[in-house]
C-alpha cells in the first residue's frame, strides 16, 4: 500500500527536478543513519529518504499544521514506519515565532522571515520553533547523515541553530538558498562561505547540466530575476549540495 501523490512527487523529484540532490542523499545514506527533512512541505524528498534510510529514523519538520497532518497520514498510508513528522519550525532559538504564509491556505512559500510579507499577501500563524541542536540532544540517537533544508530565507538561522550537530556529525547538507529570500544585508555567497567554513565543499545543482562549484555561483547569472515567475525558469538554480570535505561526489 502506498500514497500515490507522495510517490508521484518523489518520482518527479528524484528523476526530473532534483536529480543531483537525491543522488547525493542516496549515497550519504548507504549504511543507514538519521536523515532530517527541514521544511518538508508535501514530502517531495521524504519518500526517497525514508526508503534509503532503511531502519534508521527520518524526521520531517513542517511548521504548517495542515501539511504536517497531511504528511503524517501520507506516510502512514505509504508504510513509512521509520518517519516521524514534527509540527515544528526550526531556527536559531527555541520559542514561538510568526510563520508568514502566502495566500489563505498552506503554501510552499511559507517563511519565518517577516520580509516575505512585504512582497506578497500573507496570513500569520504562531508556531513553535526549536533548534536542531536542542532537538538532537532530546530526541535523536545515532549520527545524522543527511539534512535537507528548504525554509524560504530562514536557512541561516536553521544552520546557526545546528552548529553543534553539524560539527559533530558532518552530515551531507542539501540547502535551498535564494538571494530574493535572504534577510536584509545578507547574500547567498555569504551563506555558502559560512557552511564551507564548517568543513564542507559546495556545489550548485543545475538540472540537466551537472554540478557547478559554488565558488562560481553568480546571483545575476544563476538566479536572474526577469519575468513574472522568474523562479520557475529553467536557468534559475537554487539548490546547493554541501559535502563534508574529502567525501566522494
Label for each model-derived stretch:
Residues 1-249:
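Phosphate/nucleotide-binding beta-alpha loop and adjacent structural elements of enzyme active sites
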